[in-house]
């Protein structure tokens, strides 16, 4: 999707809101797939690009930052297979850096935040970033009592029984260890053990595992601990959670203590005093990477002194005192055998490359993303040439890049290897599923042609209808257990009118239709009395549904989970929401203005919602659905006692009692949004000595202004 979008600098506020809504939904979905299901659909590099774009947009438009922003979340909610464990201290993720310049900026940022400290006075540790499964091990009175996965950072899964089978994890600690100790680290599978496991699977004629990380994660989540014991999982310790006493005052000292207690620690961890030294070690580890017996995807830098870590503190989802410097993507050469066109829920035609199998970074790759029609032609998202304008043709020798677990991308073509007679690829102008016209819309505001070609068939198109149903029952929508992709496809394809499900309301009429049918579902292959009863129970359990889940489940373009929650909070009930959307059909009037005034809903998103409600077929489906389900009223946001909660604050001029970064962090911790510029949406401007144009603009707009002492008095110091 990123290739289809403007640069951040080109976005206006409405477009930025639309982008943030899309990114919030995408990142939440990929977090669940990666952390909750161990079934990622995109590479780490693509995920990082989505995350980075979200952060850049929020940085440019701070007034659009919401409480449920992806920049304030970690991971995904734990599954229901294992008992939940609430972490005593959250397991936060790390910010990423992608270049030497970014790494230098991280070091400079630490010095800037901490104030006047001489260069070379702050020590940093550097260690490999293990590509495994994050784990928290809790010891009470020196005995292992709980092992929990990261989960969503706040709540993980209890996998204690399985972790006890990992021989290198101590069951008890020495007598000098504190009463309460939480050791955090990474569980992984060695490359050699992974290769041996796959050799065993091949000898038995069974499907091979994809990569060590997913295999390690799946092995740890076995219901039978004996299976975990046979998988030869390993562990590196590198951090901690709750500690009743601190055995050291530096990062390196803590890790050395872990080693003394019997935990494996990474031998490549070292301490340095400059960005140059950190980068030298980074490139050394990068060169050693192919020879290591474990997968790594970067190097983690941390401020060594724990008192400085405490001063630097945390952002909403990551510490300021650490960053992960990611490695560049891995590449390989292979032949392009063909191009398949997939049709998604919104009708988007997405090209996927079929490749001669090739191993990239230890994983066999057979498919790669080609993004869109223009990407195949060698044209970028703003019309600029990519790959020096070289197009991609079937039969080409291509360079495939992989930086994560699943679909890689084609980044270039080897022109000297192009077969004689290879023809330019002709992107289809009709849907390969239903035969309807496939068109590229023109953006009414910019006049530019959309990069995505879409099927115009709507619900007539089987692919769109099936994907709509899959979306409707997905985890963040109605979350109906027992209705997965295969079951949806089965019901959709059925020719029996008492079994067939073609629209969402038919899910809720299935049981009634079955009562009148001689062809019982329980007699169908893959079903039985128990499974059918559980399916009906799961369906009936969703007859009462949270308003935001209902709105999200409708599959309105540009309306992700975050936007659905915004709408639910703003309108409170479906009656109010539905009536307002119908009233806004003319794209004018009070209802239209009210929709556009919601913080986080821009005109593009608003127009998509209203267009959905103008379509008679959609209204018919929604009406039938509301005869079967009852939307719950939305909960109001929890109030806070902070006098600046929800307000937009701008700091300008010099601050004398704290650094600018510390002031920003304090304001955000109290629920305020900190902006870099003054606008009519600004609530408070805190002006220090040397304040200039921002203070003038605040006075011009009538924005409340105060000095640093008044600000500190307002927030209570």
From Swiss-Prot:
Chain ranges of the BRCT domain: 639-717
Residues where Zn(2+) binds: 431, 434, 455, 461
CC cofactor: Mg(2+); Mn(2+)
GO cellular component labels: cytosol
Residues annotated as catalytic: 129
Residue sites binding NAD(+) per the record: 44-48, 93-94, 127, 150, 186, 302, 326
Record GO terms (molecular function): DNA binding; DNA ligase (NAD+) activity; metal ion binding
InterPro entries cross-referenced by the UniProt entry: BRCT_dom (IPR001357), BRCT_dom_sf (IPR036420), DisA/LigA_HHH (IPR041663), DNA_ligase (IPR001679), DNA_ligase_AS (IPR018239), DNA_ligase_CS (IPR033136), DNAligase_adenylation (IPR013839), DNAligase_N (IPR013840)
Keywords, comma-separated and alphabetical: DNA damage, DNA repair, DNA replication, Ligase, Magnesium, Manganese, Metal-binding, NAD, Zinc
GO biological-process terms attached to the record: DNA repair; DNA replication
E.C. code: 6.5.1.2
Catalytic activity: NAD(+) + (deoxyribonucleotide)n-3'-hydroxyl + 5'-phospho-(deoxyribonucleotide)m = (deoxyribonucleotide)n+m + AMP + beta-nicotinamide D-nucleotide
A Pfam family per the record: BRCT
Family the UniProt entry places it in: Belongs to the NAD-dependent DNA ligase family. LigA subfamily.
Function: DNA ligase that catalyzes the formation of phosphodiester linkages between 5'-phosphoryl and 3'-hydroxyl groups in double-stranded DNA using NAD as a coenzyme and as the energy source for the reaction. It is essential for DNA replication and repair of damaged DNA.
Annotated PANTHER family: CHROMOSOME TRANSMISSION FIDELITY FACTOR 18, DNA LIGASE
Name recorded for this polypeptide: DNA ligase
Species of provenance: Rhizobium meliloti (strain 1021)
Chain's gene name: ligA
